[in-house]
A protein has these predicted regions:
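Patatin-like phospholipase
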Residues: 1-44, 52-319
Length: 319
């Protein structure tokens, strides 16, 4: 009697990449459209955030919310702290718990894992148990931006992209036979760190102020917040202190985040050489700044495009 052929298990490894990570939403939408449903899902940093939304069955509602984010909304999630990182991240995770996912990973409808980094030992940490919201918060704790997360066992965790930007190894450990890897940093060296002097007549559309910027500034002034918001804008990529024009040189935060992403690109190349995935999706989003979380629609569209272009790689293993 012939043995039944086992259906290969598909794993999705969603990579780190800050705001470009909204492309993961488009990747998932395109896969589902083509009838490819991941059996396991894992992520590093922003990949853990989007992966958790999918594992919780909340992808489309999450996509609707992300697509409506404006600059005002992004600024509203910034809860500043003087030590350990610029932001505490409590506002974001509290919102996530209320609106999307607040359950233990073990009870997830779909097997889910997140990657974090032990700040003391440098070890890679796979988060497969406990609160899914806490796992996401640890995985997105980019050093310098978000404060580290202290776990119950005493470990201090930071962003998973520091050690494993595209967690192919975790997807395989979770039982995946076929791994689809989403690499958001493949074109990082083509990013446009703004030149010191713009060519004559050249305008950088990506840095235009939000239409509601004057109203937002008025609200800040009325609330006595103008001073610290001026400093925030000086830190943020793509704006000067008034938020009105591109800078003559990269901001401190832009330099820090771009340096981290270059490091992650090198790590990804090395790890993929040793453990190549069956399919690589590489959205081309070099034009997006790392904190452009208000530009989700174009990232989602590029995620869809890149996935559909890469699908022939997958068909060889699925047929």
């Amino acid at each position: 009697m012939a043995l039944a052929r086992r259906t290969p298990k598909v794993g999705l490894a969603l990579g780190s990449g800050s705001a470009r990570g909204w492309a993961h939403i488009g990747v998932l939408q395109a896969l589902l459209q083509e009838g490819v449903r991941p059996d396991v899902i894992c992520g590093s940093s922003i990949g853990a955030l989007v992966g958790a939304a999918y594992a919780a069955g909340e992808l489309e509602r999450f996509a609707d919310w992300v697509g409506g984010l404006g600059l005002r909304d992004v600024l509203g999630f910034m809860d500043f702290k003087l030590s350990g990182g610029m932001l505490k991240g409590e506002k974001l995770i509290a919102f996530w718990r209320r609106n999307f996912a607040d359950f233990d990973i073990e009870s997830s409808p779909l097997p889910f894992g997140a990657v974090a980094t032990d700040l003391h030992s440098g070890a890679e940490v796979w988060l497969r148990q406990g609160s899914i919201a806490d796992a996401v918060r640890a995985s997105i704790a980019l050093p310098g931006l978000f404060t580290p997360v202290r776990r119950d066992d005493g470990r201090l965790l930071v962003d998973g992209g520091i050690v494993n930007p595209v967690p192919i190894s975790l997807a395989r450990a979770m039982g995946a036979d076929i791994v689809i890897a989403v690499d958001l940093n493949s074109d990082i060296l083509h990013r446009h760190m703004q030149p010191l002097v713009q060519p004559p007549g050249r305008e950088v559309q990506a840095h235009e102020p939000a239409p509601d910027a004057p109203a937002l500034q008025a609200e800040e002034a009325a609330a006595g917040q103008g001073g610290w918001m001026e400093r925030v804008r000086a830190w943020m990529p793509g704006t000067d202190a008034a938020g009105a024009a591109p800078p003559r040189a990269p901001s401190m935060l832009d330099v820090m985040l771009t340096s981290v992403n270059i490091m992650q690109m090198r790590i990804t190349r090395s790890r993929m050489a040793g453990d190549p995935p069956e399919m690589v999706v590489a959205p081309q989003l070099a034009q997006m700044e790392l904190l452009d979380f208000h530009r989700a629609p174009e990232a989602i569209a590029e995620g869809r495009r890149a996935t559909l272009a890469a699908l022939p790689q997958l068909r060889r293993y699925m047929d």
